[in-house]
Amino acid sequence: MKVDLSITAVKAREILDSRGNPTVEVEVVVNDEFVGRAAVPSGASTGMFEAVELRDGDKKRYMGKGVLKAVENVNEVIAPEIIGMNALNQVEIDRLMIELDGTENKSKLGANAILGVSLAVAKAAANALGLPLYQYIGGVNAKYLPVPMMNILNGGKHADNSVDLQEFMIMPVGAKSFSEALRMCAETFHQLRNVLKARGYNTTVGDEGGFAPNLKSNEEPLEVIVEAIEKAGYTPGKDIAIALDPATSELYNEEDGKYHFEREGKVRTKEEMVEFWVKLVEKYPIVSIEDGVAEEDWEGWKMLTEALGKKIQLVGDDLFVTNTKRLAKGIELGVANSILIKLNQIGTLTETLEAIEMANRAGYTAVVSHRSGETEDTTIADLVVAVNAGQIKTGAPSRTDRVAKYNQLLRIEEELGSIAVYPGMNAFFNLKKK
């Protein structure tokens, strides 16, 4: 017999994200008693195929970035339709919202409106059943803690400096538990501050908590990270590996089909891009590259996958935008070997879970990710454990909007106790082991 968890109230409001921009928060109440609350994140470098984040466009409020229309869509359009529905029927509720919107990219109601409701419904149901969210979504086998992909140095759109590539990250692949992994990252982060100071650089942090110093080249970040790993007492590659998100869609010029490294003053063809990555991977302990070529450069993706696809993780973010149609094309063409999962790129929990399932069936890894505009919401920490993804990307250990996710993962690891698994290098299950 199915438990009746009737949705009795739905309320949305405008709140602020970590960049001081408005975003949507939704509360869903079940049986007049159990509340689920979710806040929606927002990205800085967005893929052209992402679901649409509805903004008001009223320049007199928040420079046009208000979300009162999205809030109104929840309160006036979605709420009347889902009140009375059973919160356990997640797929049905998500599909109903997709139909109510009626567009391919959720531009009518806004992905920020739909996602807020979708996640709040799941949280309300979990609370009503007395289950942690990861267990409600993932069931009895949800036990894998993720390897953090921790952004500790920023360039590109996330920083005002001379580095074209957007994110330089560390992955504690040699740790034995999540708590140890987090400690290794934090220690390396603090050592990086010392390394940067010794070289005369500033140590202010960017949107995601990583340092954003005015480094001289695209390779210097890798040099200082290797030095920081060693100063923290770890072996680069064995204990802590490096991951990159160059966000090359931001560098790609569609007219000439080339990559313009404006800060470096170089233009590269797709062949030269692949060669650029191959050389860096040979020189540094890089285990993962996200968006190594642009979202529409399918030919470049094929070349990159042929060159490095068996050796390192190649993550599609702008390429796939958590979208099963885009992912299916990638699988068919044999490009990339991993997908970045961002809830707000697609806009419902159901579609997110479908994308993860499709990826896993094709032998692709899934990396659950934050956005650069975050809140104190920790849903992604529960999601990554729920689906046993094994990898999470949620910023540096230096801002509460990022640390909130790591702290939630510490709680989950403690709760799981002896059944918790930290995969380490096994998170890259589809690569040839050295």
Swiss-Prot record:
Residues given in the record as Mg(2+) binding sites: 245, 290, 317
Keyword Lyase: yes
EC assignment: 4.2.1.11
Record GO terms (molecular function): magnesium ion binding; phosphopyruvate hydratase activity
Superkingdom of this protein's organism: Bacteria
Cofactor binding, note field: Binds a second Mg(2+) ion via substrate during catalysis.
Active site residues of this protein: 208 (proton donor), 342 (proton acceptor)
GO biological process: glycolytic process
GO cellular component, one term: extracellular region
Residues reported in the UniProt entry to bind (2R)-2-phosphoglycerate: 166, 342, 371-372, 393
Annotated PROSITE patterns: ENOLASE
Residues forming coiled coils: none
Leading EC class: lyase
Required cofactor names: Mg(2+)
Catalyzed reactions per annotation: (2R)-2-phosphoglycerate = phosphoenolpyruvate + H2O
Protein's cellular compartments: Cytoplasm; Secreted; Cell surface
Keyword Cytoplasm appears in the UniProt entry: yes
Pathway: Carbohydrate degradation; glycolysis; pyruvate from D-glyceraldehyde 3-phosphate: step 4/5
Main location (coarse class): cytoplasm
Record function comment: Catalyzes the reversible conversion of 2-phosphoglycerate (2-PG) into phosphoenolpyruvate (PEP). It is essential for the degradation of carbohydrates via glycolysis.
NCBIfam families xref list: eno
PANTHER family: ENOLASE
Xref: HAMAP family: Enolase (MF_00318)
Family: Belongs to the enolase family.
Full protein name: Enolase
Gene name linked to the record: eno
